[in-house]
């Protein structure tokens, strides 16, 4: 897009306002590079990108980007063998820190609001590399100003020696300056430093009383700064240690620089992404300041800007206008009084197009629609005086000639006071001819004029619409309201009457104008009245729509509250059911405990009625519809004695011993014999049943294939393990996982010793790494 157009539309001022919202030189650099795109996909992507960040910015407190800075020069220097200093390393550390903070913020945002998606920002977050190691390497080695003493063992030793030597020097010099005999010989009883050597200030006349080296003197020459000979060697030692310190610091910084070079590509990606985020957040901040909205871009040519206003004007006083190229309209001609807002309307349209194609939200109400223009051409400038009319006309015409050379069907052309600066009749003729030419090219055009001839232009050409800026004859001032579809009319008679001109003169003047012109003015006046009526109705419609939207929002909230209430009722019901299940589980444990005791008593008979009574006690705890399995049994031939069946309610196999009646049968499940409903039985193919003394009844309560004993006391853990193994056997599990944790190993040892002795366990082993490692024991059941 032409720079001249951007200058005329004052796009640089918009960029300056966006630049003020950036935090870093990275963001500022991107603002300075910001230009309107002309590719449709690029324009749409840039707008979506800004809108995503704006949505987040308007709802949440973003993490600070303070301290973010451009570090690519340091990274490249590190890559070619240079050594970075502490300050440069800290800027790189801050870049990583800002990245990590933003990534953490985004992850929390996504977790908290799973229903909202930010695909573009999500992609940027996925681009960010992991640089945790480099961050810690820098962070643990240096602070803001220098390397830590413990940055290396060698550095710590050197600095310790420097500190102890300095302390000895200070003690020696303190004795000298505090000596009563030396008080009158010293300019001041202090120890100071000259040329990196510890010295004392001695009066010049007492120089001979102090053996040592003079390093400096005062401006008056009255004071000499002497390094006493007693500390010369210690100061020399400090100098040597400082040299060693510098070498060690250089070594450490070289090592850290090597780490930076190794992560060069990752750091450059981080810099690019974080700079882009700073740029986008600056766009979002600026957009909020103008209450910007996201336009919808369309492939077909369209312009609809509801209640648009110029973003550089005071929003509290500027009049917002709806600018629209209605269907099949390619040219809009605005007429009306000077200083009525015609030029501002042109600039508003042009600047909003440029902003939108630069990825900035635009100052309109929601629902704006735009197409993407390859170029915007402007001939906009203030009128000059009559003495300058020739230069004015020549300047405009030179610009128009240049526009006509390049404009095409993908262009928006803005003409301000087209044909002005020359003879009115010739100017009007030129204006109409230029408009015809641009329409033939296929460009979208908005032009302002004060030529009355152009009012009739739209009535004999298709695709042309008149518009005007309103003038209030009562206040004798423009209202700055744009009236689409209504041409401007002369207000000379009304203004003259308002100013007190005689009615006789006004009426005589009216007789002097042509009938056609009089009829046109009356028609325009009628159009203005109709436009105001329609506008009033539209505002009322907007009000009703907003009320309807509010009602819809209220109903949606109430519906959501109802759903939440319904959910809470369901959760409450589930909780009650779980309490019953818990009671049933305890009852089942008691039954299993009884069965185990019966099984361990040699020769003890299991009384059927006792088992049936216990089963009934368990059944009483279950809700028929919500807890029992709703199993559709398969259809087979009629069940008879001797058939092998599956008991649906227990999930166990059994053999039919006797058909009691049409509804009940006696079934043997292992050592248990029970009377069951026939509808609870599913006929299976005959299989040879292995003789066993184990109880194979399955608890209806489904158990997991793993038991977590972490946190249990030793004795309680073994009791829990016993009960679990019994339930696992009844559930026909072949293998189970006992989680005991690593800890001291006492619980692991106790569990494995117990498994060795347990009758239901055939084998066990330690867990594989994928299964939990040493914290898990895997038991195989018989």
Curated annotation (Swiss-Prot):
Any Pfam family the entry gives: MSSS
BP GO terms, sorted: mismatch repair; negative regulation of DNA recombination; rescue of stalled ribosome
Key word RNA-binding present: yes
CDD domains cross-referenced by the UniProt entry: ABC_MutS2
Keywords, in A-Z order: ATP-binding, DNA-binding, Endonuclease, Hydrolase, Nuclease, Nucleotide-binding, RNA-binding, rRNA-binding
Disulfide bonds: none
Alphabetized PROSITE patterns for the sequence: DNA_MISMATCH_REPAIR_2, SMR
Keyword ATP-binding included in the entry's annotation: yes
Sequence ranges assigned to domain Smr in this UniProt record: 707-782
Binding-site residues, ATP: 336-343
Molecular function via GO: ATP binding; ATP hydrolysis activity; ATP-dependent DNA damage sensor activity; endonuclease activity; mismatched DNA binding; ribosomal large subunit binding; rRNA binding
E.C. numbers: 3.1.-.-, 3.6.4.-
Assembly behavior: Homodimer. Binds to stalled ribosomes, contacting rRNA.
Annotated PANTHER family: OS10G0509000 PROTEIN, OS10G0509000 PROTEIN-RELATED
Entry function: Endonuclease that is involved in the suppression of homologous recombination and thus may have a key role in the control of bacterial genetic diversity.
Family: Belongs to the DNA mismatch repair MutS family. MutS2 subfamily.
Protein name: Endonuclease MutS2
Species name: Staphylococcus aureus (strain JH9)
């Amino acid at each position: 897009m032409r720079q001249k157009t951007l200058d005329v539309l004052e796009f640089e001022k918009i960029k300056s306002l966006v630049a003020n919202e950036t935090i870093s030189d990275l963001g500022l650099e991107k603002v300075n590079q910001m230009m309107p795109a002309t590719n449709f996909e690029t324009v749409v992507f840039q707008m979506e990108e800004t809108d995503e960040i704006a949505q987040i910015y308007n709802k949440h407190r973003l993490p600070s980007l303070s301290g973010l800075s451009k570090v690519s020069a340091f990274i490249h220097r590190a890559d070619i063998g240079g050594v970075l200093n502490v300050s440069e390393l800290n800027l790189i550390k801050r870049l990583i820190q800002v990245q990590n903070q933003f990534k953490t913020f985004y992850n929390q945002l996504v977790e908290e609001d799973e229903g909202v998606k930010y695909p573009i920002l999500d992609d940027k977050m996925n681009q960010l590399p992991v640089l945790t190691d480099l961050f810690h390497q820098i962070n643990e080695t240096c602070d803001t100003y220098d390397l830590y003493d413990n940055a290396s063992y060698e550095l710590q030793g050197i600095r310790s020696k420097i500190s102890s030597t300095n302390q000895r020097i200070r003690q020696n010099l303190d004795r000298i300056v505090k000596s009563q005999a030396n008080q009158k010989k010293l300019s001041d009883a202090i120890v100071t430093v000259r040329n990196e050597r510890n010295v004392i200030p001695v009066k010049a006349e007492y120089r001979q009383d102090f053996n040592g080296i003079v390093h400096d003197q005062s401006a008056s020459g009255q004071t000499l700064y002497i390094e006493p000979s007693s500390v010369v060697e210690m100061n020399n030692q400090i100098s040597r240690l400082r040299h060693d310190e510098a070498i060690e610091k250089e070594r450490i910084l070289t090592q850290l620089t090597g780490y930076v070079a190794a992560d060069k590509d990752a750091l450059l990606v981080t810099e690019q992404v974080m700079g882009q985020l700073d740029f986008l957040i600056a766009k979002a901040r600026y957009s909020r300041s103008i209450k910007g909205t996201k336009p919808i871009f369309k492939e077909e040519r369209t312009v609809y800007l509801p209640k648009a206003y110029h973003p550089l004007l005071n929003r509290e006083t500027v009049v917002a206008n709806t600018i629209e190229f209605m269907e099949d309209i390619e040219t809009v001609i605005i007429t009306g009084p000077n200083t009525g807002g015609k030029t501002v309307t042109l600039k508003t349209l042009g600047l909003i197009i440029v902003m939108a194609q630069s990825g900035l939200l635009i100052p309109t109400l929601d629902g704006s629609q735009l197409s993407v223009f390859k170029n915007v051409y402007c001939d906009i400038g203030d009128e000059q005086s009559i003495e300058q009319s020739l230069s004015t006309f020549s300047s405009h015409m030179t610009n128009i000639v240049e526009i006509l050379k390049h404009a095409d069907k993908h262009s928006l052309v803005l003409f301000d006071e087209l044909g002005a600066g020359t003879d009115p009749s010739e100017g009007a003729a030129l204006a109409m001819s230029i408009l015809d030419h641009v329409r033939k090219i296929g460009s979208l055009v908005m032009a302002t004029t004060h030529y009355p001839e152009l009012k009739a232009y739209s009535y004999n050409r298709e695709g042309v619409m008149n518009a005007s800026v309103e003038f209030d004859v009562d206040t004798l001032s423009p209202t700055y309201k744009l009236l689409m579809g209504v041409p401007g009319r002369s207000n000379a008679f009304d203004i003259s009457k308002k100013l007190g001109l005689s009615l006789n003169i006004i009426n005589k003047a009216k007789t002097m104008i042509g009938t056609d012109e009089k009829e046109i003015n009356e028609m325009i006046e009628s159009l203005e009245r109709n436009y105001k009526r329609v506008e009033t109705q539209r505002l009322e419609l907007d009000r009703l729509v907003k009320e309807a939207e509010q009602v819809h929002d209220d109903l949606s909230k109430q519906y959501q509250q109802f759903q939440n209430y319904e959910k809470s009722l369901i959760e409450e019901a589930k909780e009650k059911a779980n309490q019953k299940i818990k009671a049933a589980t305890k009852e089942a444990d008691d039954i299993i405990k009884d069965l185990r005791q019966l099984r361990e008593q040699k020769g003890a008979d299991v009384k059927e009625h006792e088992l049936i009574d216990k089963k009934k006690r368990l059944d009483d705890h279950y809700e028929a519809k919500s807890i029992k399995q709703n199993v559709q049994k398969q259809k087979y031939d009629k069940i008879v004695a001797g058939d092998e069946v599956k008991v649906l309610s227990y999930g166990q196999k059994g053999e039919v011993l006797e058909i009691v009646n049409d509804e009940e049968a006696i079934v043997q499940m292992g050592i248990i014999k029970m009377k069951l409903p026939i509808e609870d039985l599913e006929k299976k193919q005959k299989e040879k049943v292995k003789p066993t003394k184990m109880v194979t009844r399955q608890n209806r309560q489904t158990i997991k294939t793993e038991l977590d004993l972490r946190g249990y006391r030793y004795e309680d853990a073994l009791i829990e393990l016993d009960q679990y193994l019994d339930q696992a056997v009844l559930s026909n599990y072949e293998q189970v996982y006992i989680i005991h944790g690593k800890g001291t190993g006492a619980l692991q040892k106790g569990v494995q010793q117990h498994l060795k002795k347990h009758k239901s366990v055939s084998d066990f082993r330690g867990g594989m790494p994928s299964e939990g490692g040493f914290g898990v024991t895997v038991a195989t059941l018989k």
